[in-house]
């Protein structure tokens, strides 16, 4: 396949940045003509390991940022990138993890959208699907892509424990002209 764009919604690692090292050669094989865009999920901030010192957290975050940078990924940290082909343009917007307690809310959607044409087609990368109803619905963002729920890790038929914690836990959801997937 030759994708135009690859969009990644976070949780590249679980506890520490070094977990990605065995997969770097595989990840280097990913290519997309219009780029690979990434946001960070709650695990990417490396707050779940045994060493919670400020130094260890900063070191892990720098390492993870560096790994993704070395792969050529565009890490969208409350910012956007416009992809244009002729007269058509799409804005890829990325926010940092918009967590709900116990997770830290690091997102700043207003900052991420600053300067965008309101009529442009927009794709938002937002790790936590709660963010969609909480802040995105009603704004001119046509498509939001989220992760976080891990719904595919345990599913029996159509039942998953993710349904108890998330109204939107997997698949496509629509309100008016806006969609979450």
Task: Give names to the regions the model predicted.
Residues 1-181:
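Soluble catalytic domains of enzymes that build or remodel membrane lipids, polysaccharides, and related
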């Amino acid at each position: 396949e030759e994708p135009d764009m690859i969009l990644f919604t976070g949780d590249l690692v679980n506890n520490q940045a070094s977990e990605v090292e065995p997969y770097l050669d595989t990840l280097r094989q990913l290519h997309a003509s219009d780029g690979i865009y990434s946001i960070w999920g709650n695990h990417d901030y490396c707050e779940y390991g045994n060493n919670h010192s400020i130094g260890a957290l900063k070191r892990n975050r720098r390492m993870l940022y560096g790994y993704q940078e070395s792969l050529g990924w565009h890490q969208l940290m409350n910012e956007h990138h416009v992809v244009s082909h002729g007269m058509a343009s799409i804005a890829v917007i990325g926010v940092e993890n918009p967590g709900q307690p116990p997770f830290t809310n690091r997102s700043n959607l207003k900052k991420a959208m600053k300067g965008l044409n309101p009529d442009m087609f927009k794709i938002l990368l937002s790790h936590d699907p709660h963010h969609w109803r909480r802040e995105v619905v009603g704004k001119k963002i046509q498509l939001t892509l989220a992760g976080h729920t891990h719904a595919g890790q345990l599913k029996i038929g159509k039942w998953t424990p993710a349904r108890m914690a998330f109204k939107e836990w997997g698949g496509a959801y629509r309100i008016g002209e806006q969609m979450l997937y």
